[in-house]
Amino acid sequence: SIRSLDAYRPTLSVMLGLGVYKPLTDKWGLTTGLRLENKGMDIDATVKNYHMEAVNEDGSGKVVGAWTGGVRTKVRNNYLTFPILATYSLGKRWQVSAGPYFSWMFDGEFSGEAHDGYIRDTDPTGTKAEVSRAIYDFSSDLRRFHWGLQAGGEFRAYKHLSVMLNLQWGLNGIFPSDFESVTFDLYPIYATLGFSYVF
């Protein structure tokens, strides 16, 4: 279990894309498009009896079991995203939107280190071994296809420039359900503040 979240640092993420808006009525419309986006974070945490598979930095081999100590994790994922959003206009300048999105992760990293703690072989009652530092890399185990919900708003500041704020909430975890090294689901949840050029 995670006993404390000692540091959480979301990275500066870049999103580039093209969107198409189709009005359906005076107020309602549909927006879709294609986005290239990256999402990332760095986390420092203290855990107890956390299932871990890692490699000892001293070259003594792989360690598997229940880890108690510090964990540092680095996440950097790049996606191609296809949103399908219903939009509602609140006057000439404001517009809100909501709907599903579908993402394909074409490049991803989930790596880090376990440090200053101990691991018990196989489970919390196993043989205890002190570990100063062990590294892990689960990048190849990341799920490629993601989907979720997006909601947000857009303000037309000028004729060709809008300011937007969006929240994306992933509905499937970043690892497959049969992945054993992380025993709970991790869902991608991100907020985006940005600008768009209106043609």
Language-model regions, residue ranges each:
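Extracellular/periplasm-exposed beta-strand and loop segments of Gram-negative cell-envelope proteins
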Residues: 1-11, 39-78, 105-146, 173-190
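Repeated loop/turn-to-beta-strand initiation elements of outer-membrane beta-barrel proteins
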Residues: 27-30, 93-96, 159-165
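Outer-membrane beta-barrel transmembrane strands
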Residues: 74-89, 142-148, 152-154, 163-166
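Short glycine/proline- and aromatic-enriched beta-strand/turn motifs that initiate or cap beta-hairpins
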Residues: 1-21, 96, 142, 170, ...
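Outer-membrane beta-barrel "beta-signal"
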Residues: 155-161, 187-199
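Transmembrane beta-barrel strands of outer-membrane/channel proteins
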Residues: 34-38, 98-104, 165-169, 197
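Hydrophobic, lipid-facing positions within transmembrane beta-strands of outer-membrane proteins
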Residues: 12-18, 80-84, 147-151, 189-193
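Outer-membrane beta-barrel strand-turn architecture
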Residues: 22-26, 88-92, 157-159, 199
